[in-house]
Amino acid sequence: MKKLDEIVRFHGHICPGLVLGYRVSVFALKNLGKRSKDEEIVAIVENNSCAVDAVQVMTNCTFGKGNLIFKDYGKQVYTFIKRPSGKAVRISIDWTPSPETEKQKEMWQRYMKGSRSKEVLKAVHQRKTKKIESILKTSDKDLFKIKHLKMPLPEEARIYPSVRCEKCGEKTMEPRLRVKNGKTVCIPCFEGRGLSGIREKMASLGITEKDIADAVKWARKRS
C-alpha cells in the first residue's frame, strides 16, 4: 500500500483534503483488496478536491484508464467498485473539524484576501496541521458513513476514432461530435464556444484577427 509521503510528493503539498482522500482509500482497499493493477477497481468521486489525488495514487484509478469517474456533485462521497464481482463500498465523510476560534477565523479571512504575513501563514499552518492530525487519529466509524453495496459494473474504457470537426478542424472523439446546420462539429463549436465561435463573435463586432495581433504587439512593446 502506498504511503502518505508518496501521495504528498504527487500532489505537491499536504493538506486536510489530501489526508481525507488517503484515509478513504485505505478503508476502500481494506474492504476490496489490493490496489488496481489496471481496471480491477473503479472509483466514483463526487468532487474534484485534493482528496481525489490521493485516491488516484492509492488505488491506481485514473481518468486515462476510465476507472476514475467524476460526478460533479460537490459532495465528499467516494464509491469504489471491484471488478468482476460488483462488490462496492460507498464512503461519505462524516467528520467535522473542531470549531474555529474568532482569531482563527480572522486569520483565515486575511489569508483568503491575499495576506501572506508571517502571522497569518503561521496561524493557517497551525490550523491545517491540527486538522490533519485529527483526521489521521479519528477512527473509521467516526470519520465515515459507510454503505456496502452490490453495484452494476461501469463500462470498461473504450477507444474511439478521432474525427475532425467540420468547423474548427480539430480532432474529436467520435461519440462527442454533434450535428449543427448539417455539419459534424465538436461540442465547443456546437455551443458557439470553439475557435469558430470566437471568430464569428469577433466578426460580428468588426474585430479582425489582425486587430488582435496588432494589439498583442502593442502590449508587448509597452511591457
What spans do the regions from the language model cover?
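Short, flexible, mixed-charge glycine/proline-rich loop motifs
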Residues: 150-162, 175-180
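Short linear interaction segments
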Residues: 195-223
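Conserved phosphate/anionic-ligand binding catalytic regions in large, soluble enzymes, centered on
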Residues: 10-24, 28
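Cysteine-rich micro-motifs
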Residues: 179-192
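Short Cys/His-rich Zn2+-coordinating modules
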Residues: 142-153, 167-172
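Short functional micro-motifs and their immediate structural scaffolds
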Residues: 173, 194
